[in-house]
Amino acid sequence: MPMRPHFHCKAALLALAIASLAGCASTPAEPVPFKEVPQARIVQPGYTEPGTGLVAVDVRRERSRDVIVRFRDALVYVDGEQVTDLMNGEHVVFYLSPGVHRIGVSTQFDPVVEMRFTVTADTRYTNRASVTFDGDHGIALRRVAQ
């Protein structure tokens, strides 16, 4: 049976190749910080300027590898006014008075998704919202817990 030793040789070479490739496995990359939205894309600058008595609210567009949504801009609204748009991996900080505000997002394909957002200086709560896309590529907005 001359074929049997040849088979064992191939199996040994395959095992050696797999073992050597497993040693080269990459480690996950460190998380990349969110980029700030350029000033040129802020259409209502009053919401992005700090002031006395105002509380910082961070709205972040989570990164997506999905090509369908990756290059879509997400329009961001505060109390019904469009303030800016967020691209993949960007964030914007709004300075809002304490109380209830409406934060909304949309794309050219989605209607405005809005949420009531209670802004508070109380450090037990986070003033951060996250913009994501669901499995059907629809835009979503949620408050992020601390």
Predicted regions and their residues:
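Sec-dependent signal peptide recognition
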Residues: 7-14
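C-terminal motif of bacterial Sec signal peptides marking the signal peptidase cleavage site
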Residues: 19-23
